[in-house]
Amino acid sequence: APGDRTAVVAWNGFEQATVVEIPAEAELDAPVRINVANVEGTRAQHLMIRAGAFSKATVILSHAGSAQAALNQTVEVETGDSANLTVVSLQEWDDTVLHASNQRLALGRDSKLTHIVVTFGGDLVRLCADTDFRGPGAELTMLGIYFVDGGQHLEHRVFVDHSQPKCFSRVTYKGALQGKDAHSVWIGDCLIREAADGTDTYELNRNLVLTEGAKADSVPNLEIENGEIEGAGHASATGRFDDEQLFYLMSRGVPEAEARRLVVRGFFAELINQIGVPEVVDHLMATVEAELA
């Protein structure tokens, strides 16, 4: 059962669930889309995404529009044995929205899950992603991108629970902040349990503070109960806009506004190019450009 308070409220409060079932051995050419928009009142929502054994698919969960109160959401993702699933969660709300999303990820034996979180909109957005390895040999990639404007609070919490042997995980989140009282929080927890021989894991969070008055909190945590692992590490870095990079570009005739865009685009591009869903990549680059306009 969920332990986070908002997760408990969402778990107990939903009236019906939306289920996306990908049959075993199916390979879907086009992404499956789930659109959540214009929420009215305080709502608890429950979504389930299940990928059958040996299936391959991409699911895009898009949040956009306005809300008069708040959305408290549970998203369950399950990959069957040897499945290959990509889940993209886009948060592009209007500036008035409160959104808490608790995303629970379960990986079967030898399966691959790529979990991508993109947060640009909302007044307060809090997304927690918890991972449970249910069989050996599973591979997890978690990518996160967020852009925080003045007055926004965007919070991302990750928990990777390595309880099975020979599993692999990589967690990389990057964020940029601009404007007074822009605030981001990233907390990354990784636990390697005693039974998880051969674990290979690494988590990274980087933040780029573009203006005065913005604040980024970053807390990576790693707990190891097993000495027989392939590797484990974590890193966090938060820095201000690099004036030397800006000067270098401007000294070669690049206008200041364009130079700033180039630096920020370069900061995000490495991560965006790993997403592997062309329509999402193009959309994100355009959104970053709009944030900097």
Question: In which residue ranges do the predicted regions lie?
Answer:
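Conserved beta-strand/loop scaffold segments within soluble protein domains that form the structured core
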Residues: 2-254, 268, 272-293
